[in-house]
């Protein structure tokens, strides 16, 4: 049970990291859809993606520190 729980937490953290990286890449390299949104929405999306990335990286680090792998 412990391994299943830790596996879930690891996979969720890696998935969130990939999601954040993809969002940041889309926002910084392919921001063609900005015209549909305000710049405030754009900044909010950037902040949310970075927050998700930082959170995911922290979770990956903590899981590695306390549970290995």
Where does each model-flagged region fall?
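Extended, charge-rich alpha-helical interface modules
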Residues: 1-69
């Amino acid at each position: 049970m412990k391994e299943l729980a830790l596996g879930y937490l690891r996979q969720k953290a890696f998935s969130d990291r990939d999601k954040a990286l993809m969002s940041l890449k889309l926002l910084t390299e392919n921001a063609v859809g900005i015209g549909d949104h305000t710049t405030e929405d754009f900044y909010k999306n950037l902040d949310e993606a970075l927050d998700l990335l930082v959170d995911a990286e922290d979770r990956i680090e903590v899981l590695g520190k306390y549970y290995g792998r």
